[in-house]
Structure formats: C-alpha cells, structure tokens
C-alpha cells in the first residue's frame, strides 16, 4: 500500500506537534526581531528609536520568552487558547524585543542584572508577566457560580434577531447621517473624526461600534456555521460598507480573522497555524519593503500591530512612574476623586508626553491599569479579564464550537490587549455584548457543527 507524502508529513506533525509548535514560535520571534532591526527604523515609532542592544536585557528577554511558552497551548480546544497565544506573540514578544535591543529606552547603563529591575522598561516587563501569569491562575480556579447560569431555549434566535436589527439600522443610519463613504485606506485618518461627528454622537458612539465590531461579525459566524455561502458574501459586503462609513481600518480586517478561525479550525485544531501565519505576514511585509519599497503593510502589520502598542506601553509606564496615577477619576470614580490632568485625557496626555500632542495614544489594559493604580491596577484588570475569559470558556464548553465563541470575542480580545482600557472595551468595543451573544447561543446543539 502506497502512502502519500502528505500522509507522512501529517504523521510527523502529529507525533512531534509540540516541538514543531515551539520551534515555530521561536522562529516567529527571530523574524520579528529582524524586522525591528531592519525595517522599523524606516517606519518611525512614536517615541525615539534607539538600536543599542543590552546583553543583559537581551538574555533576560529570551529567558522570559522561554519561560512563558509552556503556558500557551498548541491545540485549539477553547477560546482562551487563542487569547493566550495572541497575548504572548502579539503583545509580550514585541515588548521583549524592544527591551533587549534598546538599552537607552531602558535607562540602563549598569552591567548588573539586579539594577535592571529598577528601570522603567523592566517595570513594564514585570507588569506584563504578572498579568499573563495571574490570568493563567484565574483560569485554573474552579468557579461554581458559573454552573448556575440558565440556558434560554430560543436564545440563539433571539441573538440573531437582535444582531440583524442593529445591522439593518446602521446601514440606513450611515446613509441618513450623511457620512462620507471612503474605501481608500490612506485617507481613513482624515475622515474618521468628520464621519464620527456626523454619525457617532451620544448613544450612537456605542451602538455603531457594537454593530460593526460584534453584531455583524456574529451574523458572519452564524452564516459560516450554517454554511450559507451567499449570506457570508452579503455580510462581508455589509462590513465593507461599515468600513467605508466608519473610517476604521480594523473594521475591514475583522471578517478576515473570522474566516481564518473558521477554515483552519474546521480542518485541524492545531495552533501551529498562528505562528506560521504571523511568520508569513512578517516575511512578506519585509520582502515588499526591502525589494519594492512598499511601506503600506509595514505600517499596518509590523508597526501598528506589534511595535506601536509595545512602544506605547513603555511610554505609559515611563510617564506614570513619576506622575500621579488616575485612580479612575476620569470615569467610574470621577464623583469621588479629582482628575489630576485638567481636561486632557490620559491618551492625549501620553501623546503630548511623547511629542505627539494631537495623537490619541491609547494602549491596552496593562498600560491603562498601570495608569489608574500602578501594579494594583494591573492586578485588578487582570483579575476581571481572567474572570471574563474563563466565563467565555465555560459558556462555550459543550455548547458552541470553540471557533464560534472565539470569533464573537476575538475583536474585544485584541482591543483590550493592544489598544483600549478594559472598561472602554467592555462598553464601547462590545465585550459585554459579545458575552451576551455567547450566553444566548448556548443550548441549541451547536457544539457538533
């Protein structure tokens, strides 16, 4: 009996899956490091770029990287598996690279490893490690409260109805409000404020985001689940329409993420595809930049996805290490605590601090947690986020396919990890809406789909 080369390769991958996964993760870091050295200097970060490697920092960064790898899974069995691999590869790895290659930013002139703990960059790395491991701990705790969650017999169809109503409303609202429709990615920043002033005032600031971030992507996931090809195409066209009206690039790329989750998870639960895909994206971006001087993908992927969030995290720690913390005086505690920075928001304050006074320098939950209450703020946000991630795992277990739950929650996950305060993601970016949709989708026999 003749065995095909594909079958042999499949057996090799299955038998050595964990090893191949770890090697692909390591290769991803090596390629991302190469891009930081060779490509990023030509696509400036918001703070100063200093390629001044520190031997001690570099060794520590690799040691931390290897210590965290065992905490991520190489198989996709629940939504949290995606959360942690994104956390490590997209958030932590770029920070470790900057930490190892920028001794000037680290304020480190000493050769002593112990002295590095006192630098701003080291405080940032400590904060992000604490958060990663604390969320891991939360997910390992038993929470009997989740076992009492009710199941709605027709909840899935209620979720579809609500989502459809919001989508139809926004289609008409964008047309009625008079937004300027634009498909040119290079013009989105010029039109974002203009379109927002027309269509996103008051409560619409929330509902519009919920619609294109969550409701329409939920409908896309349902269409994929039911294998309705025409409906999938229609929903993607609607999402392109929402991109044209919102002027947010992320809106355009959300369907790609969900299609990726659906097609690859249906073929195999292996998560090797994540580092391999990131390797291909980084390599393609660098090839286009090196040989064709194409900087568009360099700006979107390498710069915006990986290094700007990392760079801004260091900026947040640098500023709030020597300036007053906010203690939620700009939001839930504003009636009890005075805000220390007049009318300037935290994001604009950081923008001014790094020399970009007109920039909305928003960062992920670790930066915002530190801005509010230092390491205590990081622990509090990590605890809340850990509870929410565990809730997603529990609600989707034996109820909906893992890819389906991940598709609904993936956008809020990315926002909270890279570019927004946890409370903002919960409300504005629709994390709480995502949880409600997953909750309603339980109990209708979707797990076997």
Language-model segments: what does each one mean?
Residues 66-74, 218-223, 239, 258-262, ...:
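Generic transmembrane alpha-helix motif of multi-pass integral membrane proteins
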Residues 5-6, 116, 120, 128-133, ...:
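Hydrophobic alpha-helical segments of polytopic membrane proteins
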Residues 8, 13-17, 23-24, 34-55, ...:
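Small-residue-enriched transmembrane helix-hairpin modules in multi-pass membrane proteins
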Residues 79, 226-227, 267-268, 373, ...:
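Short coil/turn helix-boundary motifs
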């Amino acid at each position: 009996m003749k065995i095909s080369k594909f079958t042999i390769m499949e057996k090799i991958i299955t038998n050595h899956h964990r090893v191949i996964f770890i090697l692909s993760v390591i290769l991803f870091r090596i390629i991302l490091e190469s891009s930081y050295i060779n490509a990023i200097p030509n696509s400036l970060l918001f703070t100063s770029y200093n390629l001044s490697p520190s031997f001690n920092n570099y060794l520590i960064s690799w040691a931390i990287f290897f210590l965290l790898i065992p905490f991520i899974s190489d198989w996709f069995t629940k939504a949290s598996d995606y959360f942690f691999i994104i956390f490590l590869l997209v958030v932590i790895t770029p920070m470790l690279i900057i930490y190892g290659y920028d001794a000037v930013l680290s304020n480190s002139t000493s050769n002593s490893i112990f002295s590095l703990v006192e630098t701003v960059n080291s405080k940032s790395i400590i904060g992000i490690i604490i958060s990663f491991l604390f969320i891991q701990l939360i997910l390992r705790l038993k929470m009997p409260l989740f076992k009492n969650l009710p199941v709605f017999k027709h909840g899935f169809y209620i979720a579809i109805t609500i989502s459809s109503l919001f989508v139809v409303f926004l289609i008409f609202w964008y047309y009625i409000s008079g937004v300027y429709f634009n498909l040119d990615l290079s013009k989105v920043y010029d039109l974002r404020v203009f379109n927002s002033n027309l269509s996103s005032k008051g409560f619409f600031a929330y509902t519009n985001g919920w619609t294109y971030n969550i409701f329409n992507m939920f409908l896309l996931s349902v269409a994929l689940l039911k294998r309705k090809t025409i409906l999938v195409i229609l929903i993607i066209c609607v999402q392109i329409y929402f991109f044209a009206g919102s002027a947010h690039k992320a809106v355009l790329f959300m369907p790609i993420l969900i299609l990726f989750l659906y097609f690859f998870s249906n073929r195999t639960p292996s998560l090797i595809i994540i580092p391999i895909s990131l390797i291909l994206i980084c390599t393609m971006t660098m090839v286009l930049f090196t040989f064709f001087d194409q900087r568009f993908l360099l700006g979107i992927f390498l710069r915006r996805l990986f290094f700007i969030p990392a760079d801004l995290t260091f900026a947040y720690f640098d500023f709030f290490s020597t300036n007053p913390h906010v203690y939620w005086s700009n939001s839930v505690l504003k009636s009890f605590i005075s805000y220390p920075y007049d009318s300037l928001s935290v994001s604009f304050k950081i923008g001014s601090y790094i020399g970009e006074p007109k920039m909305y320098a928003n960062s992920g939950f670790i930066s915002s947690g530190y801005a509010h209450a230092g390491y205590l703020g990081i622990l509090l946000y990590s605890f809340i986020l850990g509870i929410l991630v565990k809730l997603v795992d529990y609600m989707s277990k034996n109820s909906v396919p893992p890819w389906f739950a991940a598709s609904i929650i993936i956008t809020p996950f990315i926002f909270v990890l890279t570019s927004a305060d946890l409370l903002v993601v919960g409300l504005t970016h629709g994390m709480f809406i995502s949880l409600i949709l997953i909750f309603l989708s339980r109990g209708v026999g979707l797990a076997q789909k």
